[in-house]
């Protein structure tokens, strides 16, 4: 029998959300045996339901933390793993064992305004409400109680070191089921994509930080002949109706063909990744950048801004100067030229990207996961 980990989070977030997706991959690594010498003895979470603001706050601040403490005392695990920093207040004040917290990003802990060539972008929330300010103080205190922070990227680890230099940290990236996405093994049926168009995929919410509006502006400035061949496919579960309306109006004004998919099933997302001509990911800041690695694992060309943490994953040829419109326009023109030269809607999978994505397999990340757990056990 291996050492026993108790996994803890708040609500049971779906895999269509970043935190939910990362929690799911953590569970899969542990249950598949990829984290050698470790097993899950339980998960502590609660349903996401509309119980009213007061009840939700009472559960978040009082009843759920008490439940975590009680279950930890009853099960006596070797380690408690809280799988995202938004639940760091759940670190028990009297823990029977070491506690690690996965830190995805610190945008809400250390919000700022970023000045870019595309204008000012708010990273996080510079004006949280009264209860959120109290909540953030609780989260920071909880994170300070942890024995180790597991950061999902080097960019996040560097950020953590600037605001919590005394908290030990280790980098364990998110893992991806690379075999499931590999088109050489599991090619999905081509979605309904017009045969003679250039299909460009964007994945993310409508938050300005994700910079989907930047993509629309870049494409809108291309020559008519090229722009008219492009279809932008927008996928993202976190939908803001007002922001969605603004982006659609912006696309219409710029004469950009925007196809709004919204939330899609995982199989449909993989099919788009495998058959679109490229993923465009111009985000201003990321804790990791799941869509980039997942597209790479699908053999899909990617273009990203040279900003953390999405620039940690692809080869240099896929990384563009941040918010430099001319560079992005040139890259898209090149994609169009390659599409015309192929003379076919079939795009050969990018083997170099498949190889790069293999570094995020469950087996490789599982070994890093094991090192993190073993490190905190030895240091306790």
Model-predicted segments: where are they?
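Glycosyltransferase donor-sugar binding loop
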Residues: 176, 203, 229-245, 262
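Short hydrophobic beta-strand element within catalytic cores of glycosyltransferases
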Residues: 292, 297, 301-304
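Active-site donor-binding segments of glycosyltransferases and PAPS-dependent sulfotransferases
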Residues: 4-91, 251
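Nucleotide-activated donor-binding/catalytic signature segment of Leloir-type glycosyltransferases, i.e.
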Residues: 244-267
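Membrane-proximal helix-turn-helix segments that form the acceptor-binding/catalytic region
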Residues: 124-149
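Short alpha-helical donor nucleotide-sugar binding micro-motif in glycosyltransferases
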Residues: 143, 271-276
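Aromatic "clamp/platform" in nucleotide-sugar-dependent glycosyltransferases that forms part
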Residues: 284
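Conserved acidic donor-binding segment of nucleotide-sugar-dependent glycosyltransferases
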Residues: 318-343
């Amino acid at each position: 029998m291996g050492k026993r980990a108790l996994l803890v989070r708040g609500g049971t977030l779906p895999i269509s959300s970043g935190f939910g997706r990362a929690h799911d991959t953590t569970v899969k690594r542990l249950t598949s045996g990829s984290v050698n010498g470790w097993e899950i003895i339980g998960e502590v979470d609660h349903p996401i339901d509309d119980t009213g603001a007061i009840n939700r706050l009472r559960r978040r601040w009082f009843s759920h933390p008490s439940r975590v403490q009680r279950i930890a005392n009853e099960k006596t695990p070797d380690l408690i793993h809280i799988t995202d920093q938004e639940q760091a207040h759940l670190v028990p004040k009297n823990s029977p064992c070491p506690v690690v917290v996965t830190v995805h990003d610190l945008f809400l802990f250390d919000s700022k305004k970023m000045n870019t060539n595309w204008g000012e972008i708010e990273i996080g929330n510079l004006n949280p409400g009264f209860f959120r300010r109290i909540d953030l103080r609780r989260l920071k205190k909880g994170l300070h109680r942890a024995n180790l922070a597991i950061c999902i990227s080097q960019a996040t680890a560097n950020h953590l070191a600037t605001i919590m230099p005394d908290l030990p940290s280790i980098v364990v990236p998110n893992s991806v089921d690379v075999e499931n996405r590999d088109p050489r093994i599991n090619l999905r049926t081509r979605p309904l994509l017009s045969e003679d168009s250039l299909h460009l995929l964007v994945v993310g919410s409508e938050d300005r930080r994700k910079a989907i509006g930047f993509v629309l502006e870049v494409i809108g400035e291309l020559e008519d002949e090229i722009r008219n061949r492009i279809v932008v496919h927008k996928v993202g579960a976190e939908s803001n109706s007002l922001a969605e309306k603004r982006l659609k109006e912006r696309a219409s004004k710029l004469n950009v063909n925007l196809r709004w998919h919204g939330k899609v099933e995982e199989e449909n997302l993989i099919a788009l990744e495998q058959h679109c001509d490229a993923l465009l990911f111009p985000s201003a800041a990321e804790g990791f950048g799941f869509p980039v690695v997942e597209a790479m694992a699908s053999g899909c060309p990617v273009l990203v801004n040279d900003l953390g943490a999405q620039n940690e994953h692809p080869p240099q040829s896929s990384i563009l100067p941040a918010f430099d419109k001319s560079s992005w326009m040139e890259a898209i023109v090149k994609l169009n030229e390659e599409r015309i030269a192929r003379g076919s809607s079939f795009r050969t999978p990018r083997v170099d990207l498949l190889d790069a994505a293999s570094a995020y397999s469950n087996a490789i990340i599982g070994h890093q996961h094991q090192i993190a757990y073993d490190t905190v056990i030895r240091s306790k």
